[in-house]
Design a protein with these regions (language model features):
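Asp-based, Mg2+/Mn2+-dependent phosphohydrolase catalytic module
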Residues: 1-6, 108-113, 128-235
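N-terminal helical cap/lid subdomain that shapes the substrate entry/recognition surface
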Residues: 3-108, 112-117, 133
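Residue-level detector of anion-binding/catalytic polar loops
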Residues: 38, 120, 200
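Conserved residues at beta->alpha junctions
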Residues: 47, 123-126, 185
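Glycine- and other small-residue-rich loops at beta-strand/loop junctions that grip anionic moieties
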Residues: 100, 124, 158
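Short active-site oxyanion
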Residues: 119-122, 179-181
Length: 235
């Protein structure tokens, strides 16, 4: 017997706002370039969805980046280097976040339909509270306002793939079982968050960080090319 869903928990950037998830990509690329390391788009996007410090630490441990860092600085990067890059990353991201808070196409209509069905809207994010204090009000002005949001700050820094932000949502929304909740996101860590919480999980393809195209780039493609991009994103 299927359990009726009572809530949907969405991710933010790349899922409900910021088509293509470009705000963090821009900031990550900028701070690594400032440090003399030019990351590829694949390297920048692979850890997307994690807590941002964890994202930087993961990038520093990628074989090519680690080797480039060792050549430039004479030692392998560690926690100290991640701290230094994050100290530059946060202000770089905060400076541009309000430009990347527009709801993606069909998000407002989807949320409206879900609420008509009596379904509550929760959300989790890899952003910090400070970042969300910019994104959430900007998105609300444009019509998107979930019933609640939780960042890794609410769980002692235990962000994705840990499921604890999801459980915070369930508590706030007064949902008694993970079987009554659906998790939606656009990154591998989003999917793992939902799976680790033991709930039905959906991956977004169009406008996702994994696909990495702007709305204009995607809409300029033929239907065949769009389908090819969607299939590639599934891999």
């Amino acid at each position: 017997m299927k359990t009726k869903k009572e809530a949907v928990i969405f991710d933010w950037a790349g899922t409900t706002v910021d088509y293509g998830c470009f705000a963090p990509v821009q900031a990550f690329s900028e701070v690594f370039k400032e440090a003399g390391i030019v990351p590829t788009m694949e390297e920048v996007r692979e850890p997307m969805g994690m807590l941002k410090w964890d994202h930087i630490h993961t990038m520093l441990n990628m074989p090519r980046i680690k080797e480039e860092w060792k050549k430039k600085y004479g030692k392998e990067p560690g926690k100290e280097e991640a701290d230094q890059l994050y100290a530059r990353f946060e202000p770089a991201l905060l400076k541009i976040l309000n430009q990347y808070s527009d709801p993606k196409p069909y998000v407002l209509e989807t949320v409206e339909k879900l609420r008509e069905m009596g379904i509550k809207i929760g959300s989790t994010t890899g952003y910090t509270d400070l970042m969300m204090e910019i994104v959430a009000p900007a998105a609300k002005e444009l019509g998107y306002a979930p019933d609640c949001w939780f960042s890794p700050d609410s769980t002692g820094g235990m962000g994705r793939p840990y499921p604890y932000m999801v459980f915070k949502n369930m508590e706030a929304l007064k949902i008694s079982s993970t079987g009554k909740v659906m998790k939606v996101g656009d990154t591998v860590s989003d999917i793992l968050e939902g799976k680790n919480a033991g709930m039905f999980t959906i991956g977004i393809l169009e406008g996702s960080s994994v696909m990495g195209l702007s709305l204009e780039e995607y809409e300029s493609l033929s239907q065949e090319e769009q389908e090819k991009q969607r299939e590639q994103a599934k891999k």
